[in-house]
Amino acid sequence: MQINMLGPLVAHHNGTSVTPIARKPRQVFSLLALQAGTVVPVPALMDELWGTQPPASALTTLQTYILQVRRGITVALGASHNGPAKDVLRTCYGGYLLDVDPTNTDVYAFERLAEEGKRACERGELDLASARFRQALDLWRGDALVDVHAGMRIGMEVARLEESRLGVLEARMETDLRLGRHAGLLPELSALTARHPMHENLWAQFMIALHRSGRTSQALEAFIKLRKTLVNELGVEPSARLQHLQHAILRADPGIDRNGPEVPAAASVALA
């Protein structure tokens, strides 16, 4: 079974969809898939479905949702009874386990590629690192589990995945800056800073890319825009690192034009 969660939920076995259609069974399946190969306790499933106010019939209702998910698995397996499905979605002491190899999920593939990119970066293999980061990001088809109603537990996991995605994106930007690909990054960094108007790492990378592309005045304007946003929204000044970057650009510090450690180390922050 292949399960993809970095975008709309898609689960299939030999070309047959296993993705539940109804909202609650879809929610149950998603939480089990996020923890594939691990027992998810019944209280955790109830918490995801109903929060702190489960109905009196919560356990019976959960069992009904489990049965609905198993029916979908049965269809995909081409079986005429529930035996194989019960082996895939197993009842365990205190909970349920989706017995699917975690390597058959796009979440696992994303995290593996991101780790490979980090290791390549640490070895100085920047072309390989950039390629691995790109491959990891290419697995995303939209926001994680965008079509699944998320309770607290799925919501927390989605937030973790989205933060990891942003971290890998920062790492890829830094790697490409170190490879001298600043001009090609400008459209993407322009869009990213608009989407994340207070994210200092992205703004620093944008400023460096602009400066190295011969657009120094726009790099300084970017700093002014960031500062205005931070002051107006949070009442704080940009970090010392951003201010040092601005001063380096103002005095035409030759170090800012070289590929290397002058680029903000997003990879070490995002993937540590």
Swiss-Prot record:
Keywords: Antibiotic biosynthesis, DNA-binding, Transcription, Transcription regulation, Two-component regulatory system. GO terms for biological process: antibiotic biosynthetic process; phosphorelay signal transduction system; regulation of DNA-templated transcription. Transmembrane segments: none annotated. Residues 1-100 bind DNA. InterPro entries: AfsR-DnrI-RedD_regulator, BTAD, OmpR/PhoB-type_DNA-bd, Sig_transdc_resp-reg_C-effctor, TPR-like_helical_dom_sf, WH-like_DNA-bd_sf. Coiled coil: none annotated. Pfam families: BTAD (PF03704). Signal peptide: none annotated. GO terms for molecular function: DNA binding. May form, with DnrJ a two-component regulatory system for daunorubicin biosynthesis genes. Belongs to the AfsR/DnrI/RedD regulatory family. This is Regulatory protein DnrI. It comes from Streptomyces peucetius. The gene is dnrI.
